[in-house]
Amino acid sequence: MSQNASVGIVTPQKIPFEMPLVLENGKTLPRFDLMIETYGELNAEKNNAVLICHALSGNHHVAGRHSAEDKYTGWWDNMVGPGKPIDTERFFVVGLNNLGGCDGSSGPLSINPETGREYGADFPVVTVKDWVKSQAALTDYLGIGQWAAVVGGSLGGMQALQWTISYPERVRHALVIASAPKLSTQNIAFNDVARQAILTDPDFNEGHYRSRNTVPARGLRIARMMGHITYLAEDGLGKKFGRDLRSNGYQYGYGVEFEVESYLRYQGDKFVGRFDANTYLLMTKALDYFDPAADFGNSLTRAVQDVQAKFFVASFSTDWRFAPERSHELVKALIAAQKSVQYIEVKSAHGHDAFLMEDEAYMRAVAAYMNNVYKECQQ
């Protein structure tokens, strides 16, 4: 399906919101910006809009290229575009960079209007609820009364679920992919180790590293390297790299010897070049705090009791970060609450990252579901 046409050259838009946003922690952003991209056309009935919510390291650039010279397309270009599962010839698709991000939306790199300086570590901790609240403001700005679908993988899937709970009347369908109704203890532990790598980097400077012309590159690199391991499946990693060495024989030192070591260093270095450490801290805390059942006596069934959306839930067989059993929890709760849900477990060797990759069964399942969403738009 990815051989079909791309959305082409796209231009991001920064949308200013000159209004306060009260956050879940009680703090208030006096104003905020959201960076977005849109693909396709909103129909006259305004009932064909689809919101794409990104995962930890994602952003608004879902599909296409920003210039003809761009080496890479958007992070979900195989999913979003003409003739693709989320078809931009049928749907008006919106991608955004969440609050706390580092790609144009208000976050640690933004100017604090109260001080005239970058927020840095002073940018408040944000939650999935806060993101959805800001996305609702964007929905109003775009003149959309109800999303045909809210779609997301991993942390993005958590946002899709929260949308159905916070604004049940504004979502017709939720596609929750490779996600979970809350993080496991192990995942919280992984996130804390990643944060400690950043927080203990001597160049972190209590989060105000940019004002001191430093970057906690070592900590962010290690955080990404460890995170990247958890996104991959052991078998897939073994088949790709095995125990292959970069040169003939062991070097009997502590440099890079195995191909897998070289790969992880490359991924870490690349990440440091495009991502902000404070944003990484914020995103992982949003993951940790997400637990919609906590507001309903720790009952996920009660949490989804009032949702009006129909659900598509997908998991991947080798995803051990967000294992299929976590999706089963959501599916069981939806069934217990007598909600409409379709579920698929995709056999894949790619672990958690499979939701970003082109798997025929996965793509066909999403395409079939979105085809039915489109048919509803025509009624």
Curated annotation (Swiss-Prot):
Keywords: Acyltransferase, Amino-acid biosynthesis, Cytoplasm, Methionine biosynthesis, Transferase. Disulfide bonds: none annotated. GO terms for cellular component: cytoplasm. SUPFAM superfamilies: alpha/beta-Hydrolases. InterPro entries: AB_hydrolase_1, AB_hydrolase_fold, HAT_MetX-like. Pfam families: Abhydrolase_1. GO terms for biological process: homoserine metabolic process; methionine biosynthetic process. Belongs to the AB hydrolase superfamily. MetX family. Homodimer. The active site is at 154 (nucleophile), 319, 352. Residues 48-357 form the AB hydrolase-1 domain. GO terms for molecular function: homoserine O-acetyltransferase activity; homoserine O-succinyltransferase activity. It comes from the Bacteria. Transfers a succinyl group from succinyl-CoA to L-homoserine, forming succinyl-L-homoserine. It catalyses: L-homoserine + succinyl-CoA = O-succinyl-L-homoserine + CoA. This is Homoserine O-succinyltransferase. Substrate binds at residues 224, 353. Pathway: Amino-acid biosynthesis; L-methionine biosynthesis via de novo pathway; O-succinyl-L-homoserine from L-homoserine: step 1/1.
